[in-house]
Amino acid sequence: MRLAGATIIVGLSLVAASWTIASQDIAAVLASSFVAKNQATMARLQQDAVQQVCSAPRGAPVDEAVLSALRQQRLDAVVLPTDGVYLGDWQRGAAVAGNGRGLQSSDDPAKPNGGNCYACHQLAPDEVAYGNLGPSLTGYAARGQSEPMLRYTWTKLWDTHAYNLCSHMPRFGAQGILSEQQLKDVMAYLLDPASPVNQSE
């Protein structure tokens, strides 16, 4: 298949040096490929500043000052627990971590979203169905519950771009995917010594 001078072979793009695909052409292809349905609206195709930077072609010049400023903006925008309490109920957190529903066109937006954490991480060691796109989080409580550790973990859940700008991890708090209570419960699932995450097989 050919698209504006690019040869697409089984997902591999071989682009001739003399050809480029204009960004407006890409936007037009994307816009024509999606149809708004229920909560899955066309607004999802609009990239924010971080997504634009992280979608730049490999090898494109990157301004480190811009990257640093974007990371700082994300860090400054993190909202910590309103009552200062980071940990909720690990049992509820286990349910959130194992629930993959939410934000799809077929999902009821009135029902709470799940975190779908197992799609990318190993958590409880006896769970065999987990992804490995992200690091294993088994034994996470070994890191302790110091204030810096609690704040770090909360920030990663709220908006991972505050630490890793081009991370694929969902921005659970910043995007309103999970509620504050759900985030507290996931925190407990990770950090409570009684949680299955922190038990040996």
Residue ranges and their predicted role:
Residues 1-8:
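Bacterial N-terminal signal peptides that target proteins for export
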Residues 106-115:
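Local sequence-structure signature of Cys/Sec-based thiol-disulfide redox active-site neighborhoods
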Residues 103-106, 126-130, 196:
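Secretory-pathway/luminal and periplasmic proteins that interact with or process carbohydrate-rich
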Residues 14-103, 156, 189-201:
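Post-cleavage N-terminal segment of exported redox proteins
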Residues 25, 31, 35-41, 45, ...:
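Extracytoplasmic electron-transfer domains, predominantly the class I c-type cytochrome c fold
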Residues 81-82, 106, 172-175:
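Generic anion/oxyanion-binding catalytic loop in active/binding sites
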